[in-house]
Amino acid sequence: MPGDLNLKKSWHPGLHKNQAVVHAKEQEALEERRRIQERQKEIKQQRERDELQKLQEMATGKKRVQKVEWMYQDPTAVGSQQAFNEKKVDANSTDDYLLGKRRIDSIVKQKGDLEAFDDSLDRFQPKTDKSESAGIVHKVKDDPMVAVRQKGRELGYTDEANESERRSRRERSRSRERERRRPRRKREDSRDRRNRRDMEREGERRRRRRDGERTRRRERNRDPSPSVSDDDRGYRQSSREERDRKSSREEGGRSRSRDRYRNRSRERYRDRSREERSRDRSRERLRSRRDRDRDRDRDRDRDRDRDNVQSSGRSSGRSSVRSSARSERSLRDRSRSRDPDRDRDYRSRSRERDSGGGQGSDLSDEVGNGRSVLDERSTDMNASDGNSSHGYRADNEFSPSRSPVTRSHRDKRNSYRPEYKDEDDKRFAQRKDKEKEMNALPKGLQQMRAKLLASKKTTTVSGTSQTPTSAPSGSQRTPSAASGSSPTGKAATDAKLSDRLARLKAMQEDAKALEEERDERLASKTKHEEAERLRDALLRQKSAHLGRSEFAREEERKDLK
């Protein structure tokens, strides 16, 4: 049968390693217990001594002052009554011995050699109890700093030696650093000087070469002398060129290393200057962009302020007519861009108007009546629904606000009756508040409201468009009948709209109730989970405290109950 595989495990108690660890722990525990017993024994002895001293004080009636009496436990101390009573020692004798006024030779001559010397030694040594000395020894042994110093002494280290070694190491590193810095500066200075010298020499050489070439060219351009032949001139020129080539080759071989270093330094300078230039360029670009944006914002604010001042300063005339026409046109374009269904309705109405153009003056009367009705209805709709000022009334083709005469009349009215303008501002503020309330609704409710408003506008527009085409002859329908039919349609649309808004509010309340119910369910669920968690923790704690068998028995008893 194979051996026990558990012996392969590091935690197995049969291993010698684990047994040695257990033995060491047991020995430590025994040593600690022995120390505790010794300390308890010392405390007991001290208590007995204190009790005896208390009994002595009670018998004699003299109380012992326990402040600094440990300093006077030596019988040879100055003023010690025990010394005077037992050994009859002079009070100043110990001080004289310590100060060198008296000598020990007389004591040695009077008594025996060893006995007298031992007696003198006993005088100067403080007498302490064995228990106190043992406690001090134990404290010294347990002190970790004493152990560290002892170890250092054994190894031959001392604090002073370590400090001196550290200081010398620091000095060496500083001197090394100084030595490293000095020659580098010298080398750099000498290298710069050498480079400057080489550059000056090179420039001088080039200048000389240029001057020589110029003089040679001048001599060549002059008339050749009859005594000098072409061959001699060519030989001289070729030998001169060879000499120049040789000298340039030698100089190039000598200065190649210098040129290499010079090129490197120039490239480094070029790279650095290129980086600085690019950095400056980017800074300038950012600064110019910031200035441009600031100027643009300033101009825009100035133009806006000027427009506001001009629009508020205009009270009448062509300027007011033009500004109102421009604002109406912009509002109309904005509203058309917002709602494409209105453009469709406008096209259908224009087609119907073109098709019924042959009916004459009767049709124009009907159109006038419809114009007044639609103007009233559009104003009521804008006031009740909370639409913006550039809403249905601005898009209505029958609205009188599109005529310049009406606009100028309104501007004049606002100029000499400012309360009308205040009322318009109040109405506009109310509309804005309603728009904010509607925007605060959820997205689904906003979409449903937009659909309802669109359906309402289509119904009103279709009702107005049927008025001119339904009458075959304009003489049969009267303006009173047309004006009488409009309030009923308005009331019906208002009732529908209020009904749908009530439905929307009910849906919103239902959604809020559902959200609250969901939050309550989540809170109750978290509470139940927390209670279950606490119960499990308590059961686990109880089972660990009682033991598995007793806990199971208690659970069975609960189940039986």
UniProtKB/Swiss-Prot annotation:
List where Low complexity composition bias occurs: 311-324, 455-470
Could you identify this protein by its name? Pre-mRNA-splicing factor CWC25
In this chain, composition skew of type Basic and acidic residues spans 122-132, 163-223, 230-308, 325-355, 413-438, 496-539, 547-561
According to the UniProt record, one GO cellular component term is: U2-type spliceosomal complex
Function field: Involved in pre-mRNA splicing.
Its gene?
A: CWC25
Q: Which GO terms describe its biological process?
A: mRNA splicing, via spliceosome
Compositionally biased region (Polar residues): 380-390, 471-488
